[in-house]
Regions:
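Fe(II)/2-oxoglutarate oxygenase catalytic core
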Residues: 1-132, 137-159
Length: 159
């Protein structure tokens, strides 16, 4: 089971709860950094939990099984459980990301607007069991509605 993630309100519709977690390097909140004197970036504390450490290793394994892009560098893997994200840009990601979705579901394609303003018709990309590379900090994107169980993994860098 994935924990509720209350730090991403811009991604959800209405009062729904987003379940998922970021594993790897994460951004500390600016207030936390100055109050506690901690670094801007830190290794996710969840990795000390055996289950999350296993999820992180599985994410690395899955990426390595599906990719031919050996030069791509990521610092973080974002797990999303049954999440339909609304139209957004990734504010803290740097450069391109890879995304893949796994599970027993129908629908759930990634919608990407190639216009930086997010206008016009989106491109629909089937990411079920396939990695797709795109710049989520540059282009608006969202999840198509789906039925079933869907877990998406987003590989990105914050450095």
């Amino acid at each position: 089971k994935y924990p509720p993630n209350h730090n991403r309100p811009n991604l959800k519709y209405g009062d729904e709860i987003h379940y998922g977690c970021a594993l790897g390097l994460i951004n500390n909140r600016p207030g936390t950094c100055s109050k506690l004197g901690v670094a801007k970036h830190a290794e996710c504390r969840s990795l000390k939990n055996k289950r999350y450490a296993e999820c992180y290793l599985y994410g690395i394994y899955l990426y390595n099984q599906l990719t031919t892009d050996l030069k791509f560098h990521y610092t973080t893997i974002q797990y999303n459980f049954n999440q339909v994200s609304k139209k957004h840009k990734d504010k803290k990601n740097i450069g391109e990301s890879y995304i893949v979705a796994i599970g027993d579901y129908v629908g759930g394609r990634l919608k990407v607007w190639k216009d930086e303003k997010g206008e016009g018709e989106p491109e629909y990309i089937d990411i079920k069991n396939k990695l797709y590379k795109f710049n989520g900090s540059k282009y608006y994107h969202e999840t198509e509605e789906f039925v079933g169980t869907r877990i998406s993994l987003v590989y990105f860098s914050i450095l």
